[in-house]
Amino acid sequence: MLSKKNFNKICLEVRRNIIELIYNAGSGHLGSSLSIVELMVYLYFVQINFNNKHRDKIILSKGHAAPCLYGVAMEKKILEKNFKYLRKIGSKLQGHPDRKFFNHIDLGTGALGQGLSVAIGYGIASYLQKKKFNAYCILGDGELQEGQIWEAAMYIGSKKILNVCTIIDNNKFQNEMTVKETLDLGNLQKKFESFGFKVVKINGHRFSEISKILTKFKKKFY
């Protein structure tokens, strides 16, 4: 079991990795990567058993936060610590996750808005194959301006796809300005609840809150 002290230590190292990667590349999405550090560390170090053939699935729908994924993978010893190859041709560290180079993610993402639909596919596959696994889909709040997200949300609520955990990184910023200035999303909680979601708001940087809600979610299916 990962202690809070060790969790925080890993998160600090991941932050350093992210900054090193983006600094050496000369470009990258710093804010989007830093805003999901604790969540990604918890998923990779606690929530998911990568030795299980039928393990839970992770979909980083906001794929531009790939530096966080790589930073976590370095601390997990999945990737070696080499900060010189982010966004280089032929590198494992592409600007967006690419399963050809990195198979510890379950979807290669680039164009925003598609991840939740794929998570539904994994959720249905779990039922059809009679295998117990969940799908965790990390969405950006700016990404919610994509229409496909709401089609997927409608389907999840209507068909009761209960083994998909939809996680929204509500950091309130996108490329050049705030999400509200670009296209105000209104009350997200009420929107998702209207589709039949059970919505829980947490501080995504707190170990205790992440642990509580993800443990509760997983226990529903195991």
Task: Label the model's feature ranges.
Residues 19, 23, 140, 172, ...:
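A broad detector of the eukaryotic-type serine/threonine protein kinase catalytic domain
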Residues 79, 88-100, 118, 122-124, ...:
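Thiamine diphosphate
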